[in-house]
């Protein structure tokens, strides 16, 4: 694993040749992803998850709100390091993430025009002001993949109960300007994390063909 000052990086690439596409994916814990032909996956493991994966501060939640700083670091420093290592010069880029990582990925796609694909896997669309933000800020992508567990809204936490309603509204908004896949998965937030990420990867792979 490549370790930078603010995140660990694991690159999954099945070929010695230069990949034609790269998917950058944010995750809190290490997940073993299957290599896929003609593409690479760069698993990004931020050291300060709650801080780096939240684009703005949430009232009452200390240690949040550095996602914009991390996004800039990704674009200016982290992505160039990875692409130099891969020999990736031109092709398709995607950004995705799990949980708060999904929130950060969608946010990055609104701030920068370097991604063709965005993926949110069990994304934290319950986060304060997330719905309002994505209803008013367009994602600069051609294709979006958004998934959520069927039981994720079944919680006693009043804020997190909104995750399904908010996600559906964001999906409908995204469909207005990008090809969008919305997948309801079995289980709750922590069910089959690897499988859910794999399905996002497969959708990215299909988009690239």
Per-range role (PLM):
Residues 94-97, 121:
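Short beta-strand immediately N-terminal to the catalytic nucleophile in serine-hydrolase-like folds
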Residues 4, 106-110:
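Short, hydrophobic alpha-helix immediately C-terminal to the catalytic nucleophile
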Residues 24-28, 122, 148:
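The conserved beta1-alpha1 loop
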Residues 114-126:
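A conserved short beta-strand
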């Amino acid at each position: 694993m490549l370790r930078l000052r603010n995140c660990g990086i694991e690159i999954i690439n099945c070929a010695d040749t230069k990949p034609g596409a790269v998917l950058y994916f944010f995750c809190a814990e290490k997940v073993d992803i299957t290599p896929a032909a003609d593409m690479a996956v760069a698993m990004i493991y931020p050291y300060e998850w709650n801080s780096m994966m939240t684009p703005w501060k949430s009232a009452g939640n200390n240690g949040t709100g550095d996602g914009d700083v991390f996004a800039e670091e990704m674009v200016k420093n982290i992505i160039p390091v990875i692409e130099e290592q891969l020999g990736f010069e031109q092709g398709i880029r995607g950004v995705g993430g799990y949980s708060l990582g999904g929130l950060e990925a969608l946010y990055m796609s609104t701030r920068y025009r370097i991604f063709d694909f965005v993926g949110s896997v069990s994304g934290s669309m319950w986060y304060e002001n997330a719905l309002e933000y994505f209803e008013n800020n367009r994602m600069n992508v051609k294709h979006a993949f958004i998934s959520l567990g069927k039981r994720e809204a079944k919680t006693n936490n009043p804020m997190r109960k909104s995750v399904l309603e908010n996600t559906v509204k964001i999906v409908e908004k995204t469909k207005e300007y990008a090809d969008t896949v919305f997948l309801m998965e079995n289980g709750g937030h922590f069910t089959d994390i690897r499988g859910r990420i794999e399905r996002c990867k497969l959708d990215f792979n299909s988009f690239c063909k």
